[in-house]
Amino acid sequence: DRGDANLTFKRYLESAVRLVVENDHIVAIDGAGLDAELMRSHLAAWGERSAYAVSHVGWGLNARARWDAMAFYDKADFNGTELRAFAGNFLYSTGANEVAGRHTLGHFDLPLRGCTVELDGAVVVREGKLA
């Protein structure tokens, strides 16, 4: 959604992007805006199925990390640590995962806000807030 982040491009999303995932791989990137087009173009450029795979997921626990931190830095000076860590985010990542045997240059880290995350039936994040 608007305000989520794409750390590969070091930008906040300006329009909604919907990833359709089947069998551990993105099969469609839906959205009419520039953000969806950039994601489609970037992943297609690698010509590898692994670029579309789920890499890793997680959720942020750091109450002092800031969602808006990226707005304060030039792209060259920012690697997204705070956005990966801010409390209540859900981090969805695609592409490379050496542990899973997926070697590709295609990779996205997408810290998402407002999600509900369950682990083994227990809610750990509810609507973007730590449970």
Spans of model-derived segments:
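Metal/cofactor-centered catalytic core regions of large enzymes
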Residues: D1-A131
